[in-house]
Amino acid sequence: MKIKAVGAYSAKQPLEPMDITRREPGPNDVKIEIAYCGVCHSDLHQVRSEWAGTVYPCVPGHEIVGRVVAVGDQVEKYAPGDLVGVGCIVDSCKHCEECEDGLENYCDHMTGTYNSPTPDEPGHTLGGYSQQIVVHERYVLRIRHPQEQLAAVAPLLCAGITTYSPLRHWQAGPGKKVGVVGIGGLGHMGIKLAHAMGAHVVAFTTSEAKREAAKALGADEVVNSRNADEMAAHLKSFDFILNTVAAPHNLDDFTTLLKRDGTMTLVGAPATPHKSPEVFNLIMKRRAIAGSMIGGIPETQEMLDFCAEHGIVADIEMIRADQINEAYERMLRGDVKYRFVIDNRTLTD
């Protein structure tokens, strides 16, 4: 079936309207009318071929929310009319250790929502900057937020799970001191989630202008990471630090803030590598630096349910489909609080 979308035909061209083809629903498929799609910084990197392997036409978008309009005859979990979401994963091998553990995000054959090989036309997946999507029911997520919050739920499908998964894995909660480095699309979700989990949350920023905003998001304390005295006041005190900053920076500034056995987890994907950290800062206190990538389907559903229970959504700015190129330029300038979301109804305007 032919539908409307927005994508790019090359790395050097702006995004533009295009027609794409979606498969007809199979026995286990769910067909979703997309209401809103979040704009992730990785969309920009991929569509401009700043990350290797982009294939064109490229239709980005992996923060998808909408309503079920049709299901295959073997679908058991969903029915037409249900509010649902699709995140970064639309398929995986389903039988490896990672898939059996519900960690499809680490499956070696995980299929991303866009720019991954697929038997469907045109040979690679096309994302949520489009009217509809057809997905196997295993990778569809139920949304329990009220309809009026649906647009602000969209970024939870990437920014939400990217921060929730490491916070849960490293057991953020009451009695734990948790740092969140960066107050952007990822960081603002990390602050909200860590606060809701009951941790003592310290936000790190290089911008004095973000100090009050971080407190409003739920931070108990805010530190200007360029202020040596403020940083020194927190030496050897953190159980866990969630580092959301993608730009290369000095990791040693933050590893020294960890307690013995503390961990700093990186979730920002840098275009160029970070400088190697000072190993003695790690071995002298058995500190660790780790990484984390989105989350599996069961954990993503858990995150959505947690957010619905605690009234958590992203802080967003709604845009029309014809404003995506402008939104990309604004993202590069850091001119967004904190996530753009496309109103997909405007694809037909």
Curated annotation (Swiss-Prot):
Cofactor-binding details, from the entry: Binds 2 Zn(2+) ions per subunit.
Presence of keyword NADP: yes
Superkingdom of origin organism: Bacteria
Temperature dependence: Shows a constant increase in activity until 60 degrees Celsius using butyraldehyde as substrate.
Keywords associated with the record: Metal-binding, NADP, Oxidoreductase, Zinc
Signal peptide: none
Family: Belongs to the zinc-containing alcohol dehydrogenase family.
Cofactor field: Zn(2+)
Record-listed Zn(2+) 1 binding positions: 40, 62, 158
EC number(s) from the headed UniProt entry: 1.1.1.2
Stated name of the protein: Aldehyde reductase YahK
Name of the coding gene: yahK
Species the sequence originates in: Escherichia coli (strain K12)
Positions of Zn(2+) 2 binding: 93, 96, 99, 107
Molecular functions per Gene Ontology: alcohol dehydrogenase (NADP+) activity; oxidoreductase activity, acting on the CH-OH group of donors, NAD or NADP as acceptor; zinc ion binding
Pfam families xref list: ADH_N, ADH_zinc_N
